[in-house]
């Protein structure tokens, strides 16, 4: 899987000056490569800081293995500038996935790389019939179809209004119960 995403035709629509567009190449999405952990960790640390390790979401990642078919990086001119990692979880008895972290280099945020990464995860999860759970900003993630998941019980304190779920088309029953890592 390698997707090439062109620079927007209307640079002003995404906050780019026209002279910036000539210097801004397209970006690609591809599977997370082996050996990229240091760069990915640097992106995530810059986005969330060291306090992220104390958050409830981290409990779902510790000792869990990423799902490589749903996790990806974004590259501009060969450099990793964005990342999304997805993990196997259960919500009650239902298999699901947990999205996070997602991080983009601040210099590249105007390219809508984060949006492309979220859409990639949702499209790939759709093909596998899997829901996607995350802890995040409802207005931002609501654009992609994420809704509150009031019956998903995470393994620690979290603002329940920020626990969101995306469901594949045709799947009407929102999973409920304790959220546990792994399948």
Segment roles from a protein language model:
Residues 40, 44, 141:
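Hydrophobic pocket/interface hotspot
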Residues 89-99, 109:
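A conserved beta-turn-beta hairpin within the catalytic core of GNAT-like acetyltransferases
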Residues 37, 45-85:
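Active-site rim helix/loop that mediates acceptor-substrate recognition in acyltransferases
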Residues 155-183:
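C-terminal "cap" of GNAT-fold acetyltransferases
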Residues 99, 104, 110-123, 134:
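Conserved acetyl-CoA-binding loop-helix of GNAT-fold acetyltransferases
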Residues 76-78, 107, 167-171:
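Short loop segments at secondary-structure junctions
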Residues 1-35:
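Conserved N-terminal entry element of GNAT/NAT acetyltransferase domains
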Residues 126-160:
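Conserved active-site alpha-helix within GNAT-family acetyltransferase domains
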């Amino acid at each position: 899987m390698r997707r090439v995403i062109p620079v927007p035709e209307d640079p002003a629509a995404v906050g780019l000056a026209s002279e910036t567009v000539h210097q801004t190449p397209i970006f690609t999405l591809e599977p997370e490569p082996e050996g990229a952990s240091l760069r990915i960790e640097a992106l995530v640390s810059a986005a969330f800081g060291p306090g992220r390790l104390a958050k409830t979401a981290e409990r779902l990642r510790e000792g869990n293995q990423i799902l490589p078919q749903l996790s990806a990086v974004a590259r501009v001119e060969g450099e990793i500038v964005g990342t999304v990692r997805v993990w196997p979880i259960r919500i009650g008895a239902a298999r699901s996935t947990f999205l996070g972290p997602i991080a983009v280099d601040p210099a590249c945020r105007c390219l809508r790389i984060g949006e492309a990464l979220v859409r990639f995860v949702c499209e790939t999860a759709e093909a596998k019939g899997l829901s996607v759970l995350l802890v995040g900003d409802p207005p931002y993630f609501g654009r992609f179809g994420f809704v509150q998941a009031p019956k998903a019980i995470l393994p620690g304190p979290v603002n329940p209004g920020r626990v969101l779920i995306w469901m594949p088309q045709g799947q009407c029953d929102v999973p409920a119960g304790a959220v546990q890592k792994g399948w």
